[in-house]
Amino acid sequence: MNNIRTIKGGVNLKGKVKVPGDKSISHRALIIGSIANGETTIEGFLHSEDPLSTADCLRKLGVNIPEIKKNEPFTISGLGLDGLKEPKEILNCGNSGTTMRLLMGLLAGQEDKNFILTGDISLNERPMGRVGKPLSLMGGKIFGREKGNKAPISIDGNKLKGCVIGTPVASAQVKSAILLAGLKASGTTSVIEPASSRDHTERMLKAFGADISVRGELGRNVVIKSGGKLIGQRILIPGDISSASFWMIAASIVPNSEVLIQNVGLNPTRTGILNVMDSMGCNYEILDKSTIAGEPIGSIKVKSSNNLKSFTIEGDILPKLIDEIPILTVAACFCNGVSEIKDAQELRVKETDRLKVMARQLQKFGAEVTEKEDGLIINGQSKFNSAEVDSETDHRVAMSLAIASLLAKGTSKIMRADAASVSYPTFWEDLATLTN
């Protein structure tokens, strides 16, 4: 794969695009299908590094997952809640925090079995205690470096007990790990979040037959009861709105552009970017709405807009657009006035420190971006000059810098551009098609 990409500024985007399957749903379809009874067929799976790491780990746990080919449905033979095997080797999660955190929850209650999880250099420096601590409250035996906060992680499967757990931050990965553990815990497990996070796990568990309910203000309290069994399903995975966001913003800020993004997941816990686009005054409409397997989908048509307004992102909306902050930082550079991103310290422990990296790289174009402890301040109406920028191995940074390059005067280079393949393997081909 080409590690350096050259992007010419001054072109517009025209056409339609179908983004890859949702990464969050792809992980969950594999995991929940593996512990269901019977067969689960998955269509629209994201064929990229992170979900494939999940598939590889599940195979080592004895799950029959065939070779996954691009753009082809496949069928898993589930083992039931008690059928996972003790692996003969270490489970390598690659660069995928979702894989590691969800597997911690899945495996904590697999009694009398031992599991070791590791990842690449980057993943092994990311915080895992936020999952390990609540699982320990349920009786989980989880160990790792730095008092259980860093991988490699060792799990001694143990009998778990249901309890009420309040999470300090709204995190779908933490919540999902607790809910997966709750399937094997005695009694009832309740998760209470400070704000609602993405709810793909709850929707999918319910579709598979789990006894799960969502309560409280804004769905912040999720309750799951053990004792049932999951039944295999047919899962159609919609396009990932986090991947669609690059085209949504590009079409908004690049003059004379019009893009139709087809079959995008519109789960309300993921559509914070639409709220921000409304604040900006973007020109878009949602077409062909429908619901498949409990997940709302539709197509998004976006046209370029003049005189976009600055915006502030803070508080409860953060979990609904946490992965879109890099591309929204690019958008802010071309709005009138000063935009601000607050309460976003979670971005410092993603694949990279995304606040620091986005500020550093956009400044190379001439952007006025100031880094704060919990966010960024962006002075809009920037005039971008061409630059040599670096993804610093972060997929969302790579794609955000590509869109920024379209607004630069001259030709820019993006180093380590192949990082995009982590979540969007065909990004560069789709960019070429839309700008041709």
Curated annotation (Swiss-Prot):
Active site residues according to the UniProt entry: 323
SUPFAM superfamilies linked: EPT/RTPC-like
InterPro entries: Enolpyruvate_Tfrase_dom, Enolpyruvate_Tfrase_sf, EPSP_synthase, EPSP_synthase_CS, RNA3'P_cycl/enolpyr_Trfase_a/b
Family, per entry: Belongs to the EPSP synthase family.
Ligand binding (3-phosphoshikimate): 23-24, 28, 171, 173, 323, 350
EC number(s) on file: 2.5.1.19
Listed GO CC annotations: cytoplasm
Gene3D superfamilies linked to this entry: Enolpyruvate transferase domain
Superkingdom of the source species: Bacteria
One MF term in the entry's GO annotations: 3-phosphoshikimate 1-carboxyvinyltransferase activity
EC category: transferase
PROSITE patterns referenced in this protein's UniProt entry, alphabetically: EPSP_SYNTHASE_1, EPSP_SYNTHASE_2
Subcellular location: Cytoplasm
Assembly, per entry: Monomer.
UniProt-annotated binding residues for phosphoenolpyruvate: 23, 97, 126, 173, 354, 396
Any one GO BP annotation for this protein: chorismate biosynthetic process
UniProt protein name: 3-phosphoshikimate 1-carboxyvinyltransferase
